[in-house]
Amino acid sequence: FFKHRHPGRFFDVGMAEEHAVSFAAGLASQGLLPVVAIYSTFFQRAYDQIIHDVNLLRENVVFAIDRAGFVPADGETHQGIYDPAFLSQLGMPLYAPSNYQELNYWLQQLLSDRFHGPRAIRYPRGGQDTALAEFGCTGEDYDFLRKADDATIVLVSYADELADLLQAERELQQKSIACDVIKAVKLYPFTDKIIADLSKYKIILFAEECIANGSIGEHLEYALQQNGWNGRFIHCAVRNACLPHASVAQIKQATGLDAAHLVQAVQMAVTKGENLL
């Protein structure tokens, strides 16, 4: 679509991700604002250029990361589970919209004067989940999707994993376990506000379609502890870096990121409790 409307502003470099990033850095150094659209799984090929050509020089580049999270049907090599971990190491602003409205809004924001330097937005393969489309876009860094007056447990996630989180919340409610639900849009860096809001809870479950080591959840737990929080943090993420060729539902079940496993994780935390509730 963009290529046909703006042929002079579209450059297809083929399967040369390293060149794509260095090329974008050169454009940015001349005052342009390039958008680099690459699959998450191929984005890692350009990590050297992301660090040295863009991040260290604070070049004005927007990274649009496609196929983020679990990817069905494309094989083992196409899982987009590493970019939150390796981008958060650079302190780069990272956003993960959960529906079309958020994607449209935040991409426009990243292209505005509100930001300067490298920044990234990630989105999954396929269309939006109907369960998430209804929430629209508030323009906030995070939103409460469910909020109870007496909840001491909060479930947090981003992008497509939120659908399973909402299903888990409904099942927990039926078991008389009240949980709030937070939809994160800005993944990193964390704001003081979200740290303050999360610090009010005794149990936090953070679920993400990402490798656990270096992930958003791992950074969040550390930030909370540095802020003096001493509650129970449940991190549901990918512990085995090699995922099989399978459907998203099968991968979620295998990695413990389906609603059933999330419910079980919260129930175990409540049962063990350590007098937190």
Identify the residue ranges that each predicted region occupies:
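Thiamine diphosphate
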Residues: 1-117, 127, 274-277, ...
